[in-house]
């Protein structure tokens, strides 16, 4: 059965359960059958019906062959900085024999048939370019990172000119060293945060700890990598893999029409998201879903005539 060789992980809290439903629906649409392991804080999603608790996991079948397992996480970290920890702990406890393990941010939806993702990991650690790419190998931030980590025994295994998005990684058991390296780098970064200058912009050594250290893992770890471009997350047109709702203005919170009237049209990620809100899991109530779709349609109509871009 497709998906049996893989395990998928994600993390959520708060209203990200809306995005989580759409993400899981997109997995189902594109053929994934297997388990989704969800680390969470706070209450379970309202759409998680018939959940059965066993051995520290609360699970239910979202659709035939697709199981969602909720794992309560206890950490003081921001969940975005808990990604490698969750991957390592979940693999050890729940799926030690999985051929491929994937992490996706919940605000991603798939556009591509699932078997391609499994094939992708056979070429190396699967990664995607970020909106802030490129970042040349000679960039001063990379030089500062090298200086910071050299005393801890890290050295550059490959020069990178791209900057990677921290919302997705796919890795086989053979390349698991990459995830362990990511965790060590993130732990060292977090331990140093109190000693670093309080700078609230990209000059900070670790502006986004999870993402910066993922990039460092790609620099320092000797395992092969396979990197998709910005199109891999719909950051630029032409992609076929995923769509990622980047930034602070999240799709499920937007007033699309209001934004369109200010000159900001719906994004590709906005439109892709609403292809996956109705099933097998209901991201919204039926009334809310209808209203948001009308709002999105009106915004798309306005955007044909008015945009800042």
Name every feature range the model reports, one short phrase each.
Residues 1-4, 156-159, 177-309:
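A glycosyltransferase accessory/donor-loop signature
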Residues 1-78, 92-97, 285-309:
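N-terminal anchoring/stem segment of glycosyltransferases
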Residues 15, 43-44, 108-110, 132-134, ...:
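Short, solvent-exposed loop/turn segments at secondary-structure junctions
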Residues 20, 80, 84, 166, ...:
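Conserved glycosyltransferase catalytic-site signature
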Residues 29-33, 92-100, 105, 172-179, ...:
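Secondary-structure boundary elements
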Residues 37-39, 100-105, 110, 127, ...:
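A structural signal for short, well-ordered beta-strand segments and their strand-loop junctions
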Residues 84-136:
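GT-A fold catalytic core of metal-dependent nucleotide-sugar glycosyltransferases
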Residues 114-184:
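Conserved catalytic core of nucleotide-sugar-dependent glycosyltransferases
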């Amino acid at each position: 059965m497709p998906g049996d060789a893989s395990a998928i992980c994600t993390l959520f809290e708060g209203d990200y359960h809306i995005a989580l439903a759409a993400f899981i629906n997109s997995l189902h649409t594109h053929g994934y059958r297997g388990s989704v392991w969800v680390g969470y804080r706070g209450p379970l999603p309202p759409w998680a019906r018939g959940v059965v608790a066993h051995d520290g996991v609360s699970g239910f079948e979202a659709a035939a062959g697709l199981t969602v397992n909720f794992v309560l996480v206890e950490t003081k970290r921001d969940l975005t900085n808990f990604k490698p920890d969750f991957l390592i702990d979940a693999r050890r406890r729940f799926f030690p024999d999985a051929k491929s393990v994937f992490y996706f941010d919940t605000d991603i939806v798939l556009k591509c048939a699932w078997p391609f993702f499994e094939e992708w990991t056979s070429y190396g650690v699967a990664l995607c370019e970020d909106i802030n790419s490129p970042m040349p190998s000679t960039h001063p931030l990379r030089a500062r990172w090298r200086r910071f980590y050299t005393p801890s025994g890290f050295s550059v295994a490959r020069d990178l000119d791209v900057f990677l998005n921290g919302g997705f990684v796919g890795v086989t058991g053979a390349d698991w060293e990459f995830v362990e390296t990511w965790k060590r780098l993130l732990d060292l970064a977090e331990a140093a945060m109190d000693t670093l200058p309080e700078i609230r912009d990209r000059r900070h050594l670790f502006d986004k700890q999870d993402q910066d250290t993922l990039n460092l893992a790609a620099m320092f770890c000797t395992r092969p990598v396979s990197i998709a471009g910005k199109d891999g997350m719909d950051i630029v047109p032409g992609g076929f893999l995923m769509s990622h709702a980047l930034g602070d203005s999240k799709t499920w919170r937007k007033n699309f029409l209001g934004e369109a009237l200010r000159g900001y049209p719906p994004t590709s990620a906005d439109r892709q998201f609403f292809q996956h809100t109705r099933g097998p899991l209901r991201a919204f109530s039926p009334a809310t879903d209808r209203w948001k779709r009308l709002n999105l349609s009106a915004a798309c109509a306005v955007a044909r005539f008015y945009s800042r871009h």
